[in-house]
Amino acid sequence: MIQVIVNGAAQRFDRPLNVQALLEQLAIAGKKVAVERNGEIVPKSAHAQTVIGDGDQLEIVVAVGGG
C-alpha cells in the first residue's frame, strides 16, 4: 500500500500507479489538467509513464472555462 498527498489531502492506494491511472480514479481523465509531482510539472505526454510512489506529493489543477 502507498500513501500520497493529492492537493494537500492524504490518499492511499493498494499499489503504485501512474499519473494516468490516478486521473482515472479521480474521474478527471480526459479533462484539461496540469499535474505537478514533487515540485516538477508532469507533461501530459508523460502521464502514462510517470509512476507515483509512496510519499509523493501531487498538485492537480483542472482547467475551467468561463467568461
Question: Which residue ranges define each predicted feature?
Answer:
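Ubiquitin-like/PB1-type beta-grasp interaction modules and other compact soluble beta-rich domains
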Residues: 1-66
